[in-house]
Amino acid sequence: MSRNNPYHDWYIWRDPAPGGSMPNNWRSWFGGPAWEFDEKLGQYYLHIFDKSQPDLNWRNPDVRATMLDIFRYWLNKGVDGFRLDVFNAWYKEADLRDNPKQTGFHLRNFEKIDHIYEISQPEMIPALQDIRKILDAYPDRYVVGETFLADAAQARTYVGDDRLHAAFNYGYANSPFSAKAFGKAIQYWDSLHGEKAWPNYFLNNHDTSRSSIRYAGPDDDAKLKLLATMHLTVRGTPYLYYGEEIGMRNISLPYSQIQDPPGKRYWPLFKSRDGFRSPMQWNAHPFAGFSSVEPWLPVHPNYKVRNVTNQAGTPASLLNFYK
């Protein structure tokens, strides 16, 4: 690794500021500064998330061209589409200016600045248009994007005939358990799309505590059936997170078993996202039939009762309700 490496500019490197400090005041979502110093190069590299995930420099034409080629590669392999992770954080403001500071009390340092220069840059729109052109050359392909720190109106700007087919919006998933609250979230998201566009909805994902915990109890599947009725009949495309169809619950983990970087950093104030990422519960076999060896995260203790095989054979089960 050196400054002369042809791939050096594929990432965002900067020399230290006068006095040796970091290039700007940006913070990592996972905690701490967004800059990591490399002793060998004498430079900082940018990582909006974990330090093992350096941000690509999308302003480098070679990076952009290569990423577009990656889309073509997988489309040629026959994939049906893509989910773009925090895509609106791909581009950063060219001058990497300091973000303005937020007022008031904020627990996390990340929340103490207003994130305007490292997300939702205008260059993202042409990039999405190029991605969409590639997908449109293949029949029946689909691309959805996960926005980062963007409200529903901002997320909607990335959707269109020449952009994403859909973008995720957390307003629906974050609603309290009431018809009025869900109705308000649905009506607002639907109104942003209009009659000629198509909304989408999710209740669960890898960053959100399972709806079975948020809205129901350890064994209350009646509310989950009600949620499924709403979720699968509202105008729009529903997304399901694995295990949602059998009512999987979060697992409780001691600190020693946590894998999630922010969970390790903020324990016990934030006990990680690992609780809603446990292995799929297929059957009552060891490790719930997910694997023949110990998985990355432990299986929920209820797997011998709550699994696909058991519910498939129970007419009134949540799984058969989904079917």
Predicted regions and their residues:
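Active-site and adjacent substrate-binding regions of carbohydrate-active enzymes
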Residues: M1-K323
